[in-house]
Amino acid sequence: MASPKSPTRPTQQNPQPNFHDFLPTMAGNLGGEGLIGELCNGFELLMDREKGVITFESLRRNAAAVLGLGDLTDEDVRCMIKEGDFDCDGALNQMEFCVLMFRLSPDLMEASRCLVTEVIEEEFGFTRRH
């Protein structure tokens, strides 16, 4: 697995980049509130200080400086912004950023799905059919 500082970019031979999802580990160690706090800290590292949101320019600049991802193309940065930009304003606010981080974590999404399913089953008396 690649470290967070050196993700492997997709190639024809390897269409999927190597990626290790650290969010479940962070959630386990920090708890829910601690994880959200850390995501908010990450947001602040990437945001444009004057606008209070992550813009194309701030992500481009800070991804290189803070995360060591200087090899991102403009298209990579545009896609990253577009992926989480729910209100279509061309930037990520703090809520959009945190939601995006959860959506991009397969393990956290699966755990959330299981939790919601369990609550629904308990609330409405449903049982799983195999």
From Swiss-Prot:
Potential calcium sensor that binds calcium in vitro. It comes from the Eukaryota. InterPro entries: EF-hand-dom_pair (IPR011992), EF_Hand_1_Ca_BS (IPR018247), EF_hand_dom (IPR002048), KIC/PBP1/KRP1 (IPR044205). Transmembrane segments: none annotated. PROSITE patterns: EF_HAND_1 (PS00018), EF_HAND_2 (PS50222). Ca(2+) binds at residues 85, 87, 89, 96. One of its GO terms (biological process) is cellular response to hypoxia. Induction: By CHR12. Residues 72-107 form the EF-hand domain. One of its GO terms (molecular function) is calcium ion binding. This is Calcium-binding protein KRP1. The keyword Metal-binding applies. Signal peptide: none annotated. The gene is KRP1. Keywords: Calcium, Metal-binding. It comes from Arabidopsis thaliana (Mouse-ear cress).
